[in-house]
Amino acid sequence: MLELLAASPAVFIAIAFAFALLIGSFLNVVIYRLPIMMEREWRAQCAELAETAAPELPEGRFNLVVPRSRCPSCGAQITAWQNIPVLSYLMLGGRCAACKAEISARYPVVEFVTALLVAVVAWRFGATWQGLMAIVLTLFLVPITMIDFDRCLIPDSIVLPLLWIGLGMSLWHPQPGADVLFIAPPDAIIGAIAGYLSLWSFYWLFKLVTGKEGMGYGDFKLLGALGAWLGYQYLFTIIIMSAVVGATLGIALIVFRGRDHQVPMPFGPFLAGAGWITMLWGDAIKGFFNLPF
């Protein structure tokens, strides 16, 4: 199958784009619902530990599958055709079919950006096993980025499977000589450990000096997962890229937008973005800037 798709790169890119549009629609559900599910679980656990009454929750199950999506304004159930990625939003004019309330443009944006990122990966790696796994990594990084952006939270239920998939993929090497992905197990293991410990060490050093927390444990796990996928050789590139871009944007927001410097800014999106770029062009970046690692 991959051989047939490899013979028609444009077809593979088109299929990848269409597939990612559908997955992007589901990722919108993950981005919205998973933090709510986690909060409900935490509240129940806190009530159990405090031996108090469990918090009242809406009736019925609430997970990534049920209930079906509804309009947040009127509660009207979203029909199948209204879930068509991007197109349904355009056909409805960005408004609910029932109450005409405005629908956030973020939903089609997430769908389209997810598809665009996957299409770039398909173009870069082609119809190869390396390309398929790069798509998997991309689809994990999208909800990690958005949830951290919204909540300053990186769920273990996403980042830990990403870590273990990366370690598992290092045991499978169908393309000898392929660069970045399908690294040797020692490189993946060292990458995971070094990625976690590097930010963990910085966290405690920063806290010791300033008395403040500079980042969260989810950031450690995310860099560990990226190290498992890409190898320890690319950790320095990811750290430098994410730190420079994050610091530049943070300073710009403070200077030009008056952002309160005491308000924390999530670091996960910068790590995810740097990891994704490194996955595609890591060697070129290291060579251009003459990075030592």
Predicted segments with their positions:
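Hydrophobic alpha-helical transmembrane segments
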Residues: 1-22, 26, 118, 122, ...
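Functional transmembrane core segments of multi-pass inner-membrane proteins
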Residues: 4, 16, 130-245, 287-293
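Transmembrane alpha-helical segments of multi-pass membrane transport proteins and ion-pumping complexes
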Residues: 21, 25, 29, 119, ...
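Membrane-water interface of transmembrane alpha-helices
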Residues: 25-38, 80, 200-209
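Membrane-proximal soluble regions of multi-pass membrane proteins
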Residues: 32-106
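Transmembrane helix-loop junctions in multipass membrane proteins, especially transporters and channels
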Residues: 33-41, 123-127, 149, 175-178, ...
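Select subsegments of transmembrane alpha-helices in polytopic membrane proteins
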Residues: 104-111, 156
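Interfacial loop-to-transmembrane junctions
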Residues: 216-218, 251-277
